[in-house]
Design a protein with these regions (language model features):
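Catalytic domains of cell-wall/extracellular-matrix polysaccharide-remodeling enzymes
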Residues: 146-228
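Short acidic, gly/pro-rich beta-turn/loop elements at beta-sheet edges
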Residues: 70, 125, 195, 220, ...
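Functionally critical loop-and-helix segments that line ligand-binding/catalytic clefts
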Residues: 23-62, 199-287
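Cleavable N-terminal signal peptides of Sec/SRP-targeted secreted and luminal proteins
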Residues: 3-20
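Substrate-binding cleft of extracellular glycoside hydrolase catalytic domains
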Residues: 41-182
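Secretory pathway export signals and precursors
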Residues: 13-15, 69, 230, 246
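Flexible, glycine-rich phosphate/dinucleotide-binding loops
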Residues: 91, 122, 192, 217, ...
Length: 287
């Protein structure tokens, strides 16, 4: 009996050791604020940017630190701008300090830079206070903010009271105007209607960055154009479209975007004569 027990024990240990040696495919970190449920996707290599595309220019948006060499690679791959997250919604929400270096690296790589915030509507801090944190954090690093994009996606992350949500968003928009910033909203037809009940009086000066994807990765892409846009809220024309999510470009995970090629300032405009770096204000909106 003892011999049989020993053999059985050795067999179990052998199975456990074999199981431990099998490699497990670990999903990469992807921003939990992605507006779709299929964010746990292993990032695939993104298709190349089409050369000599007259109508649209390409950008990426990201929420993780990116090095100068990676952004130089991005520039060489045909991208013109990056959207950098400047506010992290975790907990009560806080300024994303990683954005400072990424913005500086993007300038040095010759890319235009836009900033977006993923606000925390459940925070004890008002919306305008969250924008204040971005303003103070970036200006302390010598970065001048010309515009900000507010992420309004993932209805489950927002309170169910649309009026309260409208007031929260409006407090950010109003504060941004006080700072002299251009304001944009990152959302979709569905998200906007669910979160704000289709709020249409946000202001005609507010730009739109909409997303439309079928899933994460290359197979989930939609056309890199505005052809699928339908009017909602106060918007009849978009400025930016996110057409792909969770793809690899230059060894880091991004979402991919397009904007009208004639609506962007030159990257050389990223620095004032006093040496301060500009963040935002590159994408001017469709005329």
């Amino acid at each position: 009996r003892m011999l049989l027990k020993s053999v059985a024990l050795l067999s179990v240990l052998a199975v456990l050791c074999h199981s431990a040696s099998v490699s497990v495919k670990v999903l990469p970190f992807v921003d939990s604020s992605l507006p779709v449920k299929f964010r746990e996707v292993i990032a695939e290599a993104a298709p190349r940017v089409p050369p000599n595309l007259a109508s649209y220019a390409f950008a990426v948006d990201l929420s993780v630190p990116v090095s100068l060499s990676q952004l130089q690679c991005l520039k060489q791959a045909g991208y013109s701008a990056v959207f950098v997250r400047a506010y992290n919604p975790a907990g009560q929400g806080s300024f994303d300090t990683n954005s400072c270096n990424t913005i500086q690296n993007a300038y040095n790589a010759g890319l235009g830079t836009e900033i977006y915030m993923t606000p925390q509507p459940a925070s004890s801090k008002q919306g305008y206070q969250q924008l204040d944190e971005i303003y103070q954090g970036l200006t302390a690093r010598g970065i001048t903010i010309r515009s900000v994009w507010i992420q309004v996606t993932s209805p489950t992350n927002w309170p169910s009271n649309a009026n309260n949500n409208v007031n929260f968003i409006n407090s950010i928009v109003s504060r941004a105007r006080q700072y002299g910033m251009t304001v944009g909203i990152y959302t979709s037809y569905y998200d906007w209607n669910q979160i704000t009940n289709g709020w249409s009086s946000i202001g005609n000066d507010v730009l739109l960055w909409y997303w439309n994807v079928l899933g994460g990765g290359v197979n989930g892409e939609t056309p890199a154009s505005f052809a699928d846009f339908r009017a909602f809220g106060c918007w009849t024309t978009p400025s930016v479209k996110q057409f792909a999510q969770v793809e690899q470009v230059c060894q880091f995970t991004v979402n991919r975007d397009v904007y009208a090629a004639g609506t962007m300032l030159k990257a050389a405009d990223a620095v004032e004569e006093d040496g301060k770096i500009y963040a935002g204000g590159f994408i001017q909106g469709s005329q």
